[in-house]
């Protein structure tokens, strides 16, 4: 390998430099054979053939001269012949600061000289070319006499010249490319540079938290306001002002050479503004009044690097190249100094030429405006000013705007029909990049919402357990609840122990949550936030074995979501959706409901009615015996008191409508009873959103959607056990009931055994079991109808049957023979008074005795004493998954009990109030009937409430294992007494299961939670680069050539050594994202398929798993074990049909499940999609503990929304979305590594900490450089901090924000705004919303179409 100078390659060959042009002009270019692309030199070209004679290649590409490009304005080029030996360049500049003379005895400033240090940056470039052996052979021969020999030799000469000139041109292009890349490295984005200049600090000053946070916020604001500034406005003054800011933000060069780059009138050029051809064209059109084409003087040769007294260079560490430095220093400050060669750094005595270019006047600066298209044309190198940009967008779906706060900001531009889709939107509309309307609704989200991992809280539970337990006041509020299990045999005997102890019971977290308003719930003062991690699970602390433990239980029902996250009005709106879907909203039962409410709240309710209920206890034969008595009671109380008796008992209403339709009671009264049953059936039909006949896992599919159809949920009052199809564990004594332990009632014979066991824990049931429909209607009646119409002002009660029978009927005449029984009247005054109260005072004593004797006859069908059953059951197969597989729901049922709507006075000693369920635990009724409860309420009057706050006996109080929890009771306690309230309580029984979500979504019914959709899009962008004149010195030498000889050819490698030296007093260059070139992704509605992200997960029940996958649209079964391991190890990319690529690469929308009450204003400005800011400029991110608290400690106010969070299900450690999208948790779940997650950068804590450390360092670095080297540290090198490009190209990741898009919950609203160009304005139209984009991308993209 040899090293040659370019001039030494062919020393014996004397050829004119114009020989190439001469040959080209004398040959017909149309006959050139070398129109194909080839590499190197082909030896076949020198074979004797006709084609070879004409085979002369003509390169039509324009040659590039560095000095004739506008980028040269920013350079000062000097030749340094020994540059290849230089390893480090350190140059010190003496700069004298200007002074101002003063007077009036003011001390004049002293002469000040600043010593500025600059370091050179080495950047060699190289290019190679090949010459074939045949070519070199011809060059060694002299010209012969034949024309053919001369032509072959000329061809060889031409090959060499072409290669040399092409290589020289490549070096020139390479010099430009290397130079512009170097400038870009020291040209910070304008939004950073402007922020730093506005927040100047002393370089040695430590930034305060406030300063750092302000700088970060300014970064963000300036980026948002300046992104695509050429596209976003046609305001010429705005564009001009922005360009002036770019120019004014930069500093001048230390080297202020006024001899080069000046206009004809002597005006010096101050800098150069470079862009892509498209950007420059836009600027030229917009600012044509400020642009003119003028001639400027440019140098045509390099300067020479020498030592001289004028050049301010005092020391150069160039190793061997400056060994004779002492020769120069001897002459410093001596007369012989002038003998040194003059420096052309300052005295450019080089030749100059005139060049026409576009000049723009920006502020007081004269700037060259140009592009470098000719440099990169036909090359495989992209223009460095053509760059990539990734932006993340977020938008909400399914948010609920309450009617109370509903308003319209749209004047009268829009009118929407009064449909539930408009009153409770379940879709979101927006445009993709081709302005095609996109719509996403809940059915589109099913691949994300119904993945098994959503319904498994194992990871969340583990994180919650490992987290620090509450301390101080939080401990007192959250960690005092203790759940006690007792055998049901002791329930009644220990019923009032709690009240006798006169001990205040701590509130559960559910009670604490539901006492808060929506606004208060999201505040940092809400210490229950830490337990709100998942929409489908309750987390809480409990006392267990004298230590604090955690409890995680499935919420089971939608209505169990805390009311601040799913308020009452939202549930009513959902109900209206179901009513509209079922087409049942045109029926009017207002009068019946009004009558029932008056009846249930009447304090004079006859006590005999309760006795009749007990004697009949749902038995048809007993009802026939007492039919006349029932008829008389109903008739009297309806006609005289206008009260509908027995409307508190479902079985009585059912029997009345079945057997009293023969005009034995007033027709209007009978109609009301029929209406009650019709209402129940109407509710049943409304909430039945699936086919009754469809089965899944051997159960009705409708039972997977609503718990009222689930056999595992029992009615709260039973007189006969239904068929235990769910295999629930029913316990009445100390052991669970079985078919052998449940005895049948035999009314037809004298069953002394049953009579003896009336007050035992033995369970007896009728032969006729209630049907499925009857049980469903009974549950609707007791869980929906009664609570809605009484506002929970009811109480369960037990009855001492044996004592009552002995006291009232084990007397004369009832124990006399039949003849005497019929003749003698009743002598029991209490019984006579009870009967008189029930049937009216107009009856004679004989009539009253006859009624009493009818009551006695029904004793044949006597029931047993009241008992409390404890029913424990697993969840349905779709909810029996993951951590819920072993969960057992718990409910307590009153067997042979009563539902009291008024306190008992006369027969108080036989009745026992039993607050067994929060629907049926009215403290007033309990207190009036039991002295212990009354005393307890006097001590703790705040317990006189019907919203579930009245404490139940501890053995009956299992909030987190019950089907219905606090939100149900709170709603029922304050709802209106209307049909809507009844249906709302029914719809609140919808399950939080994948099957329920699928079927509701298909019917366009809101599933109970909103969603935040997050999408990342990729863009090709054009940038602007401004650099001050002579901002960078370029030191170059002659190229060196090395050869590599082979048999058929010789390769020549040309290396150009270049060293760059920053000459700016500060930042002398800046960049800006000027305009959008193209959108690479489709900006569409493709939703992330979690089944492909987490391929191994499946529902526990294979039938449920297949059903869900089929209805979600995942037809493929779960991968085999081998396939799953391959996916987890190597990843897998889903193959999609090519038709989907019509609009570009699909962007993935990921789903973050969000409460419906999240503030809509949060989505109108750039925010973090997790619902809480991840910026930690207020703390030191290197302090891991403080950084983690800033991220996850919700007792600290969020810096963006000024609340703790807007989405507790995503922002907290261990929350649902944190588990789904935090890569550190994904590793525990097994995921497809080739799946892309736009959410990962917002949820992965390690990456967030790393990003914040970087931003912390970035701000610190740039704050040091806010001043120039003249008034700051003179050793500062003004170059971009490491990672600045990443901030510019991926700002959302580093600023931890996503941008809102132009979207609307209603298509009409979106279209109305789009046609008016109102894409940046956010509006509200009652329940609907429209969000404006902060970056007007829709208008920008439209201008590109």
Swiss-Prot record:
SUPFAM superfamilies referenced in this protein's UniProt entry, alphabetically: Major capsid protein VP5
Protein name: Major capsid protein
Disulfide bonds: none
Record HAMAP family: HSV_MCP
InterPro entries the UniProt entry points to: Herpes_MCP (IPR000912), Herpes_MCP_upper_sf (IPR023233)
Subunit structure: Homomultimer. Makes the hexons and eleven out of twelve pentons. Interacts with triplex proteins 1/TRX1 and 2/TRX2; adjacent capsomers are linked together in groups of three by triplexes, heterotrimeric complexes composed of one molecule of TRX1 and two molecules of TRX2. Interacts with scaffold protein; this interaction allows efficient MCP transport to the host nucleus. Interacts with capsid vertex component 2/CVC2. Interacts with the small capsomere-interacting protein/SCP.
Superkingdom field: Viruses
